Regions:
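Short, amphipathic alpha-helical interaction segments positioned at domain boundaries
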Residues: 242-262
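Conserved N-terminal substructure of TIR/SEFIR domains
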Residues: 1-71, 183-184, 189-197, 201, ...
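C-terminal interaction surface of TIR/SEFIR-family domains
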Residues: 129-190
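TIR-domain catalytic/interaction hotspot
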Residues: 48-103, 108
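Short glycine-/polar-rich loops that comprise or flank the Walker A/P-loop
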Residues: 3, 69-70, 110-115, 133-137
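Beta-hairpin "wing" of winged helix-turn-helix
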Residues: 234-237
């Protein structure tokens, strides 16, 4: 089964030591695990597009890519610092704000347990990370000079191994979660899952008539349980007043485990 990895990069630091280097390590890690992994870079707006009307579409594409990803990998190398508002406070270091935005969205949509943080400590230590990053997802670290570094290949091999290990731990955790979820599915959930397993999403039940309201009761109960279990997620189109439920990556694993989806 194909799984997608969303790579959130930044360009504040040299590509050779960060963006392209981390991408090479991710590709190496994925290829050593499976041929089914697909790595997608975060879309970024070119400098000449800043402020134009089409800019929001990049954010839409970015969020959609994160929603469909199994794993989020972000470069949280420290790129800047805050200016204290009085002399009694010290400067605080910070990663790229776009990476933090994407990571926060990923945490809400696919969960902290599927987020991998990576940082080049040549530009700052892990202990300098913002509190949430430091305590929730302590970053995988490496140290590489921005110019020609004789240890580049050695550092990349070690980083690829660390990323591979993190992905494998996530895979084991997902397998255990799928097994646990399967024990919590009642007949209403199984009927709904079997009905819509072949579709990427399904609509909220129609309740225009009294009969439809009664018929929707077991469906609504199944939907609530599947939402609680993280098997589906809800999206709403406010323009047409339509609710739709989409299978999550975890939901896809559950469907495959039940032989409802190939």
């Amino acid at each position: 089964m194909e799984y997608k990895i969303f790579y959130s990069w930044q360009s504040d630091l040299p590509h050779r030591s960060n963006r392209s280097f981390i991408r090479e390590a991710i590709d190496e890690a994925v290829s050593s695990i499976s041929k089914d992994g697909v790595v997608e870079d975060s879309p970024r707006v070119d400098e000449g597009m800043d402020g134009v009307a089409g800019t929001p579409e990049v954010a839409t594409i970015m969020f959609q890519k994160i929603d469909s990803s199994a794993i989020f990998i972000g470069d949280v190398s420290l790129v800047g610092s805050t200016e204290p508002f009085d002399e009694n406070r010290v400067k605080k270091r910070t990663p790229n704000p776009n990476v933090l935005l994407e990571m926060g969205y990923a945490a809400a949509r696919i969960g902290w347990n599927r987020i991998i943080c990576v940082m080049n400590e040549r530009f700052g230590e892990r202990q300098e990370q913002p509190f949430d990053v430091r305590n929730r997802r302590f970053p995988i670290n490496y140290r590489l000079e921005p110019g020609k570094d004789p240890n580049r290949d050695t550092v990349k091999t070690r980083l690829a191994g660390d990323i591979k290990g993190a992905i494998e731990v996530m895979a084991l955790s997902e397998h255990q979660r799928v097994a646990t979820i399967r024990t919590k599915l009642d007949s209403r959930c199984l009927n709904l899952m079997n009905q819509f397993a072949s579709q990427p999403s399904f609509p909220s039940p129609n309740t225009s008539t009294a009969g439809q309201v009664l018929a929707s009761i077991p469906i609504d109960a199944a939907i609530m349980r599947l939402l609680d279990l993280g098997v589906i997620r809800a999206d709403v189109n406010t323009q047409i007043g339509l609710y739709a439920y989409h299978w999550t990556y975890l939901g896809d694993l559950v469907l495959r485990g039940l032989a409802m989806r190939k």
